[in-house]
Amino acid sequence: FLKIAEVGAGGNKLTLSMSVAVEFRDYLGDFIEHYAQLGPSQPPDLAQAQDEPRYYMDLKENQRGPGLGSTQGQTIALPAQGLIEFRLIDDYGVEEEPAELPEGTSLTVDNKRFFFDVGSNKVSEVKPTYRFGHTFCK
C-alpha cells in the first residue's frame, strides 16, 4: 500500500511544479528499485475496497510551463509495472534554487475566492458553501 495524499471533498485535482515532481519521483525511487528486484508473484484474490482514493498522474504543459497533474478518483492505482515511468521526470525535471517568496494574496474568480499563502505553501478555495485548502510539501 502506497499512500500519496489525503484530499477532502471538492479538492480532487493537484498540480505539482516540475521541481516538486522530481522530489516526488525520488520518494518513489526506493519503491521502484525494490519492485524491480521482486520476482513474478501470484497474489491472492483480494476484495477491493470501494472507498479508497485513486490518483491519476498526467505530465502536461500549459502557458506557465510543464507540470505534473494529479487527479483524485475513488481508489488508489499505481500499477507496479508503470512505476518505472516516473523516471521520465529526469528528462523534464529541473533543480531550482530556493527563491525569495512574495507575500500571500487572494484572487476572486466568479463565485470563488482563492487565498495563496506562499509562506506555508498553501492554497485555500472559498465558496459560499464551504472552504477547502491544499498544502503542498516541498
From Swiss-Prot:
Keywords per UniProt: Activator, DNA-binding, Nucleus, Phosphoprotein, Transcription, Transcription regulation
GO MF term set: DNA binding; DNA-binding transcription factor activity; DNA-binding transcription factor binding; DNA-binding transcription repressor activity, RNA polymerase II-specific; double-stranded DNA binding; double-stranded telomeric DNA binding; mRNA regulatory element binding translation repressor activity; purine-rich negative regulatory element binding
Keyword Phosphoprotein assigned: yes
GO CC, alphabetical: cytoplasm; dendrite; glutamatergic synapse; neuronal cell body; nucleus; postsynapse; postsynaptic density
Name of a matching Pfam family: PurA
Record's function text: This is a probable transcription activator that specifically binds the purine-rich single strand of the PUR element located upstream of the c-Myc gene. May play a role in the initiation of DNA replication and in recombination.
One record GO biological process: negative regulation of transcription by RNA polymerase II
Subunit: Homodimer, heterodimer with PURB and heterotrimer with PURB and YBX1/Y-box protein 1. Interacts with FMR1; this interaction occurs in association with polyribosome.
Subcellular location field: Nucleus
Main location: nucleus
Modified residues (Phosphoserine): S70
Annotated family: Belongs to the PUR DNA-binding protein family.
This protein's record includes keyword Transcription: yes
Protein name per its UniProtKB record: Transcriptional activator protein Pur-alpha
